[in-house]
Amino acid sequence: MTPPMCSNSFFNHSSSIDHDSLPTKIVAGSSVSSFFCFLLEDSSSSSSSASSDLRFLSLDSSFSLSLSEDEDEDESELEDSFDSSFLVSSFSSSSSSSEEESEEEEEESLDSSFLVSASLSLSEDDEEEDSESEDEDEDEDSDSDSDSDSDSDEDEDEDEDSEEEEETALAFSSLACLEALTSFLLPFTLVVLAILFYPAWVE
């Protein structure tokens, strides 16, 4: 603010006064006017300083308000970013936990399917082994039956052979008996016949 100029008619009653010659020409009216001008200038300077102080205070307060608003905005932005980062981290953690749960469920399902397939394969192997053992038992039974049949046939053949041998032995023994009997009876019969028919032959 520019200080007000001393333009009052009371102070400027003498237009012919040269202000440059105030120190040399001392006039009562001019000294009074200069004194009041000094007072007015002092009051105007004080008012201008006060207004400048007020302006500075207003600028300072507006600057502080703008700074506080900026700080509030920064804090709100930080809070928003923190909230967004927290939401992102929570979402990522939840998604990772859900992925881990899904992976665990898949592993459990794979393990259960593997166990089921392993049990089925073991049961199939057991059934195959049982069928093979049954076939082997049947083969052994058939072999034993065939062996028993062959043994019985061999026994029958041996019995027949032994019977034939016994029969041949009996025949040979009977022939031997006949030969012995004939060898004994033939001279005896000749002697008996000679005794019986000798007198007839003599006559």
From Swiss-Prot:
Keywords: Membrane, Transmembrane, Transmembrane helix
Main localization of the protein described in the UniProt heading: membrane
Biased composition (Low complexity): 111-122
Residues passing through the membrane, by range: 182-202
UniProt entry tagged with the keyword tRNA processing: no
Membrane topology, from the record: Single-pass membrane protein
One annotated Gene Ontology cellular component of this protein: membrane
Record field: compositional bias (Acidic residues): 68-82, 98-110, 123-168
Subcellular location: Membrane
Span list, region Disordered: 65-84, 92-170
Miscellaneous notes: Almost completely overlaps NSR1.
Protein name: Putative uncharacterized protein YGR160W
